[in-house]
Amino acid sequence: MDLVIMNFVFLLYLTSVVKCSIKLDFNKVSTPSKYTKRDALPMPLINDKILYTTELEIGSNKDKVSVSIDTGSYDLWVMSNDAVCYKVSEFQTEGAPQLPDIFNDIDQDYSCTFNGTYNSKSSKTFKNTSEDFSIGYVDGSAAQGVWGYDSVQFGQYGVTGLKIGIANRSSVSDGILGIGIANGYDNFPVLLQKQGLINKIAYSVYLNSSNSTTGTILFGAIDHAKYKGALSTVPVDSKSQLSVNVTNLKTKNGNVASGGHSILLDTGSTFSIFPDEWIDALGHSLNATYDEDESVYEIECDGYDEHFFGFSIGDSDFSVPIQDLKTEKDGQCYLAIMSNSVIGGGGILFGDDILRQIYLVYDLQDMTISVAPVVYTEDEDIEEILNPNEDQNEVPTSTSFTQSASSSGSQPSSTISGENMDKNTTSSSSGNCQTRSWIAILSALFLVYIHII
């Protein structure tokens, strides 16, 4: 995996329909990628990774900026047009842990402005808050700048008055569009609903298979073709992050953990984060060898067809192939799950490697998440998520659960220091839609970018 960096571009489209057929043609391009996260849960920098990003147009000049889509945070922040880019060793979060090499390359050379910048000074719709913006990540990367408000356009639609962090110094390669639980102000999903673009603050996520080049997110709607059985609805068990109770954690050879555990379901993370004992159980089930230098388990690169990591959420059972939980470096394969003891805190997280097996419906209004085993298909059966005041189920074809779980986690607090602060120097669409409702459904398609380094 050291040779390939994959970056999914998330292209947004808004339609005032329920049933749509949309054809998109994309160009395959090369792009550097270097990403970590965030403030809901400390995260590792993962050098060979998949990013889900959307191209936004910000301000009166419609500056084009690509930002990572993240259910684990709630802010939008982007690079300023005058941003200075640094290596992490030059501009970093103090006290960041030493991460295993297979997850981290803090001195990779890249441009933080590669994915576009925003010129707030030339935007006629920009409003300065005079607040300092600062964010630091567990891998050591950081960004600083100012907060402001401006309009954000996506396709032919947009929202106004969205709070934006504008970074003028950064050792992070990509800005972030957080679509998680709002905290203190109306973030992107809330404004979509308040400004009449969707009926309810809810969206569904379909990441598709690990070798696919496409996936979809629908704001305000569900695609029934993308899952099997019934959606199982469970409560979000945190006021600040989109985590749920997960049970029945197991492998082919036995249990990984007993009871229920609060786990963040985070599309903004390529890999998952487990406690040491869970990783040990997985490693032992594979007869893997622990690499003391890398602090990870060495595994075979193939031959695990019958092995899996299983778990349950509500009434739904899931099975993740072990092949989806590995990474490769210099011809050696590893079990690619980060230990939460390495990054500090007791938080547990399911990243994209696991979430590809789940069709997810995040309801930020009712604070629930609905899940079902995913079906990989190009078929569509899209239905809007109804207004809670209507006398119908808000999430169609679902069963509900109320469960308790043990939960532990940590919120990062970071200060930033700088040394050696020298400056580093299309798509098309077509389709037919049958109008059935005024309710707008915001949909998205992802395109994979492959970069050989």
From Swiss-Prot:
Key words, A-Z: Aspartyl protease, Cell membrane, Cleavage on pair of basic residues, Disulfide bond, Glycoprotein, GPI-anchor, Hydrolase, Lipoprotein, Membrane, Protease, Repeat, Secreted, Signal, Virulence, Zymogen
Disulfide bond as UniProt keyword: yes
E.C. designation(s): 3.4.23.24
Gene this chain is encoded by: SAP10
UniProt-annotated stretches for the region Disordered: 387-432
Catalytic activity: Preferential cleavage at the carboxyl of hydrophobic amino acids, but fails to cleave 15-Leu-|-Tyr-16, 16-Tyr-|-Leu-17 and 24-Phe-|-Phe-25 of insulin B chain. Activates trypsinogen, and degrades keratin
Protein name: Secreted aspartic protease 10
MF (Gene Ontology): aspartic-type endopeptidase activity
Lipidation (GPI-anchor amidated serine): 429
One Pfam family here: Asp
Propeptide segment residues: 430-453
Bias (Polar residues): 423-432
Sequence positions that bind pepstatin A: 70-72, 138-139, 266-270
Residue spans of biased composition, Low complexity class: 397-417
